[in-house]
């Protein structure tokens, strides 16, 4: 599980596009805390602090504490919006979580020991079907990533979710099938020379 962190925030009395634009001009990001059978809470956070956490990695899989005017609230980031042109954070949604809460989280998949895969050594390719897997997991036990060991995999082999070690108590959101995470595909055949190219060689 990623190390938790704390952000300071203040409540927002006004909502809407005009209010949000004003916050951004002042170096703040509008955000909402929702869930846990409580009414949504509109807040504003430091743009600099949130951007640093997003760029540090693991933002969507790390439970954080938000200090809202002295009240400590445990949350899990559920979504954030980026400006498509200027690439800065425009808004964040946080899910309120309590001790032992079950949450659904998209967890990134990492692959290791590629050099120990006979299929890859023979020129095969790693075809990643799922870069992330959505898990139902305790908010206190969210993994930073899932690891797939490629040792011994040959061309034609498939990695299913059942082959991936999950944290204790975690289950895939997709529960009705043993879905594919990755495959080792065969070597790409070189394109055959065209008739035009062959004819050119004969003339030469």
Swiss-Prot record:
HAMAP family: Ribosomal_bL25_CTC (MF_01334). The keyword Membrane does not apply. One of its GO terms (molecular function) is structural constituent of ribosome. It comes from the Bacteria. One of its GO terms (cellular component) is cytosolic large ribosomal subunit. InterPro entries: Rbsml_bL25/Gln-tRNA_synth_N, Ribosomal_bL25/Gln-tRNA_synth, Ribosomal_bL25_b-dom, Ribosomal_bL25_C, Ribosomal_bL25_long, Ribosomal_L25_dom, Ribosomal_uL5_bac-type. This is one of the proteins that binds to the 5S RNA in the ribosome where it forms part of the central protuberance. It comes from Rhizobium meliloti (strain 1021). This is Large ribosomal subunit protein bL25. Part of the 50S ribosomal subunit; part of the 5S rRNA/L5/L18/L25 subcomplex. Contacts the 5S rRNA. Binds to the 5S rRNA independently of L5 and L18. Keywords: Ribonucleoprotein, Ribosomal protein, RNA-binding, rRNA-binding. CDD domains: Ribosomal_L25_TL5_CTC (cd00495). The gene is rplY. Coiled coil: none annotated. GO terms for biological process: translation. The keyword Ribonucleoprotein applies. Residues 1-20 are annotated as: Disordered. Belongs to the bacterial ribosomal protein bL25 family. CTC subfamily.
């Amino acid at each position: 599980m990623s190390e938790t962190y704390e952000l300071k925030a203040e409540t927002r009395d006004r909502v809407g596009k005009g209010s949000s634009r004003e916050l951004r001009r002042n170096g703040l990001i509008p955000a909402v805390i929702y869930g846990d059978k409580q009414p949504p809470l509109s807040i504003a956070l430091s743009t600099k602090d949130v951007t640093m956490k997003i760029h540090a990695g693991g933002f969507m899989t790390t439970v954080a504490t938000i200090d809202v005017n002295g009240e400590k609230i445990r949350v899990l980031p559920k979504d954030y919006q980026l400006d498509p042109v200027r690439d800065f954070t425009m808004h964040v949604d946080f899910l309120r979580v309590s001790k032992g809460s079950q949450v659904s989280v998209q967890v990134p998949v990492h692959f290791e020991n590629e050099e120990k895969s006979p299929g890859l050594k023979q020129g095969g390719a790693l075809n990643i079907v799922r870069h992330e897997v959505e898990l139902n997991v305790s908010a206190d036990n969210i993994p930073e990533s899932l690891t797939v060991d490629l040792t011994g995999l040959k061309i034609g082999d498939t990695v299913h979710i059942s082959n991936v070690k999950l944290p204790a108590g975690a289950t895939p959101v997709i529960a009705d099938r043993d879905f594919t995470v990755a495959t080792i595909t065969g070597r790409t055949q070189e394109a055959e020379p065209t008739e035009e190219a062959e004819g050119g060689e004969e003339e030469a």
